[in-house]
From Swiss-Prot:
UniProt keyword terms in alphabetical order: Ribonucleoprotein, Ribosomal protein, RNA-binding, rRNA-binding, tRNA-binding
Gene this protein is translated from: rplP
Function of the protein: Binds 23S rRNA and is also seen to make contacts with the A and possibly P site tRNAs.
GO biological process terms held by the UniProt record: translation
Organism: Thermobifida fusca (strain YX)
Pfam families: Ribosomal_L16
Cellular component aspect of the GO annotation: cytosolic large ribosomal subunit
Protein's name in the database: Large ribosomal subunit protein uL16
Oligomeric form and interacting partners: Part of the 50S ribosomal subunit.
Family under the similarity heading: Belongs to the universal ribosomal protein uL16 family.
InterPro entries membership: Ribosomal_uL16, Ribosomal_uL16_bact-type, Ribosomal_uL16_CS, Ribosomal_uL16_dom, Ribosomal_uL16_sf
Biased composition (Basic residues): 1-21
Superkingdom field: Bacteria
Length: 138
């Protein structure tokens, strides 16, 4: 699981998900990638499930890059608790992903295998995504 080793503050404000991503919107490392079409919080479990879905399909070949990291804690109060008495305890770690962000990249496998592996990974993510190919000039 992806979680930060050490954090300065245990609880944080929720980051805004409005607008489009400013950076990380093109494929840099691999040949193919998964680009978010909507904004959402992606948990560490969803990132791991997508990674496993990709690597199982490509078997031994290829290389996978994960361009997002869950560094923001989301808190939750226990069930049947009265309101007040402070903020809840941190429950899980999320990566705030804005629309347009390339989250995963893949290289070293044929195009049909890469597209199928990325399609399987998209099913594990909480937002609409598309498979993008590296452009010639990059």
């Amino acid at each position: 699981m992806l979680i930060p080793r050490k954090v300065k503050h245990r609880k944080q404000h929720h980051p805004s998900l409005r607008g489009r991503a400013k950076g990380g919107t093109s494929v840099h490392f691999g040949e193919y990638g998964i680009q978010a079409l909507e904004s959402a919080y992606v948990t560490n479990r969803q990132i791991e499930a997508a990674r496993i879905a990709m690597t199982r399909h490509i078997r031994r070949g290829g290389k996978v890059w994960i361009n997002i990291f869950p560094d923001r804690p989301l808190t939750k109060k226990p069930a049947e608790t009265r309101m007040g008495s402070g903020k809840g305890s941190p429950e899980w770690w999320v990566a705030p992903v804005k629309a347009g962000r390339v989250m995963f990249e893949l290289a070293g496998v044929p195009e049909p295998v890469a597209k199928e592996a990325l399609r399987r990974a998209i099913h594990k993510l909480p937002m609409k995504c598309k498979v993008v190919k590296r452009e010639a000039g990059e």
